[in-house]
């Protein structure tokens, strides 16, 4: 078995990726392996942006947000000839094992390399929390805390002016960021891909909340639902005659120093990944499920649809409107 191991981050960046990189490199060295850092995701393999970890200050990056080795979306990697080229380049360098950190696109790319003989272990690194068979992904907790802090501040000013705020958060097609931020902040109205409401329906609920004496109303919405957030807020103001503002939390959700939870989660997953590589395992995804670090076949993870939590969405809406 070759002692050279590649480490890459791919797709959207997530707080805690640097913790994973650092612990992967340190764990690899402790087991007698030679870790290599691959810059800018899968495109970095093709561009030969590959550097021995010993030539990079990986020890001091755990507390920083983002990913110090860069990331990218590389749709060309879906082509078999590009995958074959990646295998050829990795083989030339002597890298026979690869740890990939990212979301479902990263998992799919890693699985393709696994089928072509590269030993691959995947770690879930995405703020969206949309990877199957794991309760939490690296970056979700930090992003959630960013959203909660933002909504808490909006609540302060909304209370002062008797306003309604419509807040759009990330999550792609997974509603976890919206759902759990609504739980944490008491957002009165929650709109997700399993609970879509019209401006008329939202306006009625907003009026009901103010009629109960509430000084403000927060509407939390998952991205990719509304064609235009500002127009949606303007329509609510038109129908209710209540001052309504909109805010897209945006890419601040991706940044910031990772929470202690994300750093520890990344470290534990990295240690497990290196344990599996030391056992010559491949094609496995690391997860945190039911309070334990576990492993699942990557093929099984990418073949399952994102879990739905509609019952909880409806329950939170009901509770927060009282």
Curated annotation (Swiss-Prot):
Entry GO MF terms: 6-phosphofructokinase activity; AMP binding; ATP binding; fructose-6-phosphate binding; identical protein binding; metal ion binding; monosaccharide binding
Pathway: Carbohydrate degradation; glycolysis; D-glyceraldehyde 3-phosphate and glycerone phosphate from D-glucose: step 3/4
Chief location of this protein within or outside the cell: cytoplasm
Catalytic residue positions: 128
Annotated positions binding ADP: 155, 186-188, 212, 214-216
Enzyme class (EC, first level): transferase
Binding site for ATP: 12, 73-74, 103-106
Keywords in alphabetical order: Allosteric enzyme, ATP-binding, Cytoplasm, Glycolysis, Kinase, Magnesium, Metal-binding, Nucleotide-binding, Transferase
Catalyzed reactions per annotation: beta-D-fructose 6-phosphate + ATP = beta-D-fructose 1,6-bisphosphate + ADP + H(+)
Binding site for substrate: 126-128, 163, 170-172, 223, 245, 251-254
Family designation: Belongs to the phosphofructokinase type A (PFKA) family. ATP-dependent PFK group I subfamily. Prokaryotic clade 'B1' sub-subfamily.
Oligomeric and partner information: Homotetramer.
Full protein name: ATP-dependent 6-phosphofructokinase
Native organism: Mesomycoplasma hyopneumoniae (strain J / ATCC 25934 / NCTC 10110)
Origin organism lineage: Bacteria, Bacillati, Mycoplasmatota, Mycoplasmoidales, Metamycoplasmataceae
